[in-house]
Amino acid sequence: MVYDFKAEIVKAKNSGSHHWLLQRVTGIILALCSIWLIYFTLTNKNNDINIIMWELKKPFNVVALLITVAISLYHAMLGMRVVIEDYVSCHKLRNTLIVIVQLFCIVTIAAFVVAMFYRG
């Protein structure tokens, strides 16, 4: 008998382990981003807004802040999906709420990216 690894991968992907893994990976990335965010906050706590805005225009800080916000919202989207799937019994309402949460996160990430690169 030949063991079918592809079938096991597909079964695992549909069983929730993929979602579980995404939650853990985004959580680890958020923990690392939190270290940067705490450092950035503590080093700029006595600065005025102009200096902080100048610091945020540095490429490393721009990328770090974009990653932090995007991963935070994606992590929240994954978590909200689990909560909605577990506690909303009406299928139509459940699917509607999941789509609303996903759209909210995508629009918020897109608006944040535009705001970070807006030079007004």
From Swiss-Prot:
Membrane topology: Multi-pass membrane protein
Compartments where found: Cell inner membrane
Periplasmic side, ranges: 41-62
Cofactor: binding comment: The heme is bound between the two transmembrane subunits.
Keyword line: Cell inner membrane, Cell membrane, Electron transport, Heme, Iron, Membrane, Metal-binding, Transmembrane, Transmembrane helix, Transport, Tricarboxylic acid cycle
Residue sites binding heme per the record: H75
Lineage top rank: taxon: Bacteria
Pathway the protein contributes to: Carbohydrate metabolism; tricarboxylic acid cycle
Needed co-factor(s): heme
Record InterPro entries: SQR/QFR_C/D, Succ_DH_anchor, SuccDH_FuR_B_TM-su
Pfam families per UniProt: Sdh_cyt (PF01127)
A Gene Ontology biological process term: tricarboxylic acid cycle
UniProt function note: Membrane-anchoring subunit of succinate dehydrogenase (SDH).
Quaternary state and interactors: Part of an enzyme complex containing four subunits: a flavoprotein, an iron-sulfur protein, plus two membrane-anchoring proteins, SdhC and SdhD.
Protein name stated in the entry: Succinate dehydrogenase hydrophobic membrane anchor subunit
Native source organism of the sequence: Rickettsia felis (strain ATCC VR-1525 / URRWXCal2) (Rickettsia azadi)
Gene behind this protein: sdhD
